[in-house]
Amino acid sequence: MSNFTAKVPLSERMADVLISKDRWKDDEEGYLKVKYGLEIILINVMKFALVYGIALVTGLLLQTVTVHLSYLWLRRYSFGLHATKTLNCTLISLMMFVLAPFVFQNVPSNNWIVLGTFAFILLNMFLFAPADTESLPLIGEEHRKTLKRKAMIGTLILTGIALLIPFAEMKTLIMIGSLFQVISINPLTYKLLRRRYRNYEKYE
């Protein structure tokens, strides 16, 4: 294997195998777009398989699903930071969705803690959601207002679920997933990671 081949990411090599470049020989731009999209899908599939494979082997599947779904529920409208490198994204995902559930799986919470925590989360959604990135600026003030409103409604719905669920440990895991999303939209996180905040201002 050549040094060049060894340095090519696995996802890119798989995309090359799955897409016939000959079919796109008259449309190089189209080929690159399709290849990039396929690479993103392959990266996410491999990351998903790794995270949930480890969760399954370690007996943390339910805990991982709880934290992950809580995180995704709020992220749908509040957006937030993404890791800039695939390896970093994978490592962060393992820490968030495998290590954190392992650490907090037996930590119970009561409804007073739930109310206090989600009051803090709701405040952050009001102040900072939605948060964009350099690669995905959220353009349009009305669009951002709509996303903020939906993010806050989503937070209230998740609060209700956490209050009503009868398992004290599950309440904790829901809060952990939600707090991870709060971290990803907080401007302090952007500052610490030296990432640009309010990227839409560059286009408006």
Swiss-Prot record:
Which InterPro entries does this chain map to? AgrB
**Keywords of this protein's UniProt record, alphabetized?**
Cell membrane, Hydrolase, Membrane, Protease, Quorum sensing, Transmembrane, Transmembrane helix
Q: Which residues cross the membrane?
A: 52-74, 87-107, 111-131, 156-176
Task: Give GO terms for biological process.
Answer: proteolysis; quorum sensing
Role according to the record: May be involved in the proteolytic processing of a quorum sensing system signal molecule precursor.
- Family from the record: Belongs to the AgrB family.
Please state what the protein is called. Answer: Putative AgrB-like protein
